[in-house]
Amino acid sequence: MALLTPQGVKEVFQLQRPQGRERLRRLLNWEEFDEQRDSRRSILLDTLYESIIFAVGKGFPWVEVAQVVKFTEELLRETKGCSITEAVTILGNKLRDYRGHFNTTHLLALCDYFHHTFIRHYKLYQYVLGQDQQVDLTVAHLEVCMPPHPLPLAEGMDRDLWIHEQQVATLTEAEAQKRADVLLLKEALRLERENSLQKAFAAAAPAQPGQVLERQELESLICQAVHTQMELLQELLQRQIQNTFAILDLKLQKKTLNLNAPTPIPPPITSHAGQEEALKPQRASKGKKAKARK
């Protein structure tokens, strides 16, 4: 591990946690790694970073803070694969070795820190840092869409009233569509009539220019034109009647909805004049009761 300087650990501490961890990684000369896939290195970096936070919190000088990081890294490396009894022995030996770097108070604080963190959770540290782990990680990137900003409460309405207005709007739209269907049907039948008559006239036209149609042929052509006109008119009337009944049914539904419309909630009375208006019926009632008693 690269030897940290007092200035280096000071820079790490003064940064926010994410930036501080990144600065510590650079000072340790570690290569960049995937925090999610390389959990071992991520936890090791967390442990070293937390040792800096602990030392500064206990008032260690910056020189001793750098030594605490070195102490932590050596302890984790030397206890790899050891039993907890061996780990306690190694911790005691290292504390004695570092007596020249820390005063008695800081040495006791360091001993207490590792007993309550490293030794207490020793099996977990060994499992994470001492064994190769097979990582099977699936990463999914989700796009979170924020809900739209709600309108001011004063512009809102009662839920039942809103549902009623939506139902009325749906019926109104359906009625308008029915009326549009009638206009489209008239136009379609008109075009069909013109096309049918044009075909009939073209078929009955004389072969030679200037040739006059016989009376029988002319009567047949007129009958055919009248028959075509009557068929299309009958279809138009039938469709119009159907649409008229459908429109009347929609109007009846709207009328029924409006008769059963929910009563809107009146706005709260906030002004002095409004409060006076609201109190008038109560005052009148009290006056009548007083007169009755007399």
Swiss-Prot record:
Region (Disordered): 259-294
Comp. bias (Basic residues): 283-294
Signal sequence bounds: none
PANTHER family reported in the protein's UniProt record: COILED-COIL DOMAIN-CONTAINING PROTEIN 189, SIMILAR TO 4930578I06RIK PROTEIN
Protein name: Uncharacterized protein C8orf74
Organism: Homo sapiens (Human)
GN (gene name): C8orf74
